[in-house]
A protein has these predicted regions:
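C-terminal transmembrane helical hairpin of 12-TM major facilitator-type secondary transporters
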Residues: 317-363
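A late C-terminal transmembrane helix in Major Facilitator Superfamily
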Residues: 375-405
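Cytoplasmic membrane-interface "Motif A"-like loop-to-helix N-cap segments
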Residues: 90-101, 312-323
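Extracytoplasmic gate region of multi-pass secondary transporters
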Residues: 42-43, 249-298, 392-397
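A membrane-interface helix-boundary motif in multi-pass transporters
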Residues: 186-203, 402-420
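Glycine-rich segments within core transmembrane alpha-helices of 12-TM secondary carriers
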Residues: 161-185, 384-396
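Multi-pass alpha-helical transporter architecture, strongest
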Residues: 212-219, 367, 419-438
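C-terminal ends and interior cores of transmembrane alpha-helices
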Residues: 102-120, 325-340
Length: 438
C-alpha cells in the first residue's frame, strides 16, 4: 500500500509538469503566429499600404488611412473574445486555440495576394479591411485561451514564468516579422519592394501556422477546466461573458488601464516611429527595422527573466516598475529622434519596448485571468484584454500620426500621450490590492 502511494506521487508530479510544459510550448507557438501576423501588418502599413492601397490621397492622409485599417483589426478583437471565450468556457480551451491559429494564418496569407489599387481599384482597400477584420476576430480569441491554458496548467508558484511564453511569442513574432521585412528590403529596390517584396512575409505565415498547429495538437486540456466541467452545474446558466461582466465589472476597467503602458510603448516604437522617422525626419527605414530586430531578440530573454522575478518578488512590483520606466522614457525617446542621435534612439527604444513593455506584459496572464472565476475566465479575461486593445492600442499609430499631422509635425503631443498612458498604468497597479497581485 505504501509503495503504491509513494510511486504514484512522483508520477503525478511528472505528468502535471509535462502537461504544463506542453501547454506553455503550444501557447507560445500560437502566440508567435498571432504576433508575427499582427506586427507584420503594422510594419507594412507604415511602409507600403499608404502607397499601394491609398494612392489617390496625399501622403499624410494615405498614412492615416493605412493606420486606420490597422485599427480595424482591433475593433473586431472584442467580438472574437466574446465568441471564442463563450465556446472556450463551454467546450474547452484547446479546440478554440486550434481554430484561432488557422483563421489568423489564412487571413494573413490572403493579404499577401491582394492586388493593388492600380489593378482593382477600391476593391483593394475593401479586401484589405475585410481580411484585417478576420485577423482581429481570430486574435481576439487567442490571448484569453492561450493565457488561460498556460496559467491553469502551470505549477502554483511558477504561473508567471510558465505563462510568459504567451508574451515571449511577441518577441519572436517581432523578430521574425521585422527580420524578414528587413532582409527583403535590403535585397530589393524600392520599386521591387513596393511591387512584390512586401508580399513574401505575408505568405510565409503559412509555414508558421503549420508548426503552431503541430505543437498545439500535442497540448492537453487543463485539469482545472476538466474539474470545473465535472462539477454540478445550475440548470440555467447565463452567457459566460455576461457572468463575468455582472460579477466583476471593475475588472474590465482595471485591465484597460493596466494595458495602456504595454500598448502605447509597443505600437509607438514598432509602427508609428517607423513611419515618423522616415517620412518626417528622413531617416532610413532600416534603422527602425533593425531596432525591431533588436527589441524582438531581447524580448525573448527579458520577458521570461522578468516573469521569474515576478514569481519571486511580486507581480505588482514588477508591473509598477515597468510602467514608471515607460513614463520616464517617453520624452527622452522623442528628443533623441529629433536630434537624430542613433545611440540614444536605440537606448530609449529599448527602455520603452523592452524594459517597460516586457516588465508589464510578463505578468498579465496570471494577473488578468485571476480576476475571474474558472467557469467564465476565458470570456472575462479574453474580452477584457481585447476591449483594452481597442481602447488603448488599436488606433495608437493613427492617433499619434494625427497628432503630428495636425500640430504641424511637432512631436510633443505624442510624447505626452505616451507618458500619460504609462502613468495611468503605474497608478492603477499601485492602487490594486497586494493580496490579489502581490
Amino acid at each position: 500500500m505504501d509503495s503504491t502511494l509513494t510511486s504514484t506521487g512522483p508520477q503525478q508530479d511528472t505528468s502535471s509538469l509535462n502537461r504544463a510544459r506542453r501547454a506553455a510550448l503550444g501557447s507560445f507557438a500560437g502566440a508567435v503566429v498571432d504576433w508575427y501576423d499582427f506586427l507584420l501588418y503594422g510594419i507594412t502599413a507604415a511602409l507600403v499600404f499608404n502607397r499601394e492601397f491609398f494612392p489617390q490621397v496625399s501622403p499624410a492622409m494615405g498614412t492615416l488611412a493605412a493606420f486606420a485599417t490597422f485599427g480595424v483589426g482591433f475593433l473586431f478583437r472584442p467580438l472574437g473574445g466574446i465568441i471564442f471565450g463563450h465556446f472556450g468556457d463551454r467546450l474547452g480551451r484547446k479546440r478554440m486555440l486550434m481554430l484561432t491559429v488557422w483563421m489568423m494564418g489564412i487571413a494573413t496569407a490572403l493579404i499577401g495576394i491582394i492586388p493593388s489599387f492600380d489593378t482593382i481599384g477600391w476593391w483593394a482597400p475593401v479586401l484589405l479591411v475585410t481580411l484585417r477584420a478576420v485577423q482581429g476576430f481570430a486574435v481576439g480569441g487567442e490571448w484569453g485561451g492561450a493565457a488561460l491554458l498556460s496559467v491553469e496548467s502551470a505549477p502554483k508558484n511558477k504561473k508567471a514564468f510558465y505563462s510568459s511564453g504567451v508574451q515571449v511569442g511577441y518577441g519572436v513574432g517581432l523578430l521574425l516579422s521585422t527580420g524578414l521585412v528587413s532582409l527583403i528590403s535590403s535585397q530589393t529596390t524600392d520599386e521591387q519592394f513596393l511591387s512584390w517584396g512586401w508580399r513574401i512575409p505575408f505568405l510565409f505565415s503559412i509555414v508558421l501556422v503549420l508548426g503552431a498547429l503541430w505543437m498545439r495538437n500535442r497540448m492537453d486540456e487543463s485539469a482545472e477546466f476538466e474539474q470545473q466541467k465535472q462539477a454540478p452545474q445550475p440548470v440555467k446558466k447565463r452567457l459566460p461573458v455576461i457572468e463575468a461582466l455582472t460579477r466583476h465589472p471593475g475588472a474590465f476597467l482595471k485591465i484597460i488601464a493596466l494595458r495602456l503602458c504595454e500598448l502605447l510603448t509597443m505600437y509607438i516604437v514598432t509602427a508609428f516611429a517607423l513611419n515618423y522617422s522616415t517620412q518626417n525626419l528622413g531617416l532610413p527605414r532600416e534603422l527602425f527595422l533593425n531596432i525591431g530586430l533588436l527589441v524582438g531578440g531581447l524580448s525573448c530573454l527579458t520577458i521570461p527573466c522578468f516573469a521569474w522575478l515576478a514569481d519571486r518578488f511580486g507581480r505588482r512590483r514588477v508591473y509598477i516598475t515597468g510602467a514608471l520606466v515607460g513614463t520616464l522614457s517617453a520624452f527622452p525617446f522623442f528628443m533623441a529622434l529629433e536630434a537624430q542621435s542613433i545611440f540614444w534612439i536605440v537606448f530609449f527604444a529599448i527602455m520603452l519596448a523592452n524594459i517597460a513593455h516586457d516588465m508589464v506584459v510578463c505578468v498579465q496572464q496570471p494577473m488578468f485571468t485571476g480576476l475571474f472565476g474558472a467557469s467564465y475566465r476565458y470570456s472575462g479575461a479574453g474580452v477584457g484584454y481585447q476591449v483594452a486593445s481597442v481602447v488603448g492600442g488599436g488606433f495608437t499609430p493613427f492617433i499619434a500620426a494625427a497628432l503630428v499631422t495636425f500640430s504641424g509635425g511637432d512631436w510633443h503631443s505624442v510624447a505626452i500621450y505616451l507618458m500619460t498612458g504609462c502613468l495611468i498604468s503605474a497608478v492603477t497597479a499601485m492602487l490594486m490590492r497586494d493580496k490579489q497581485h502581490a
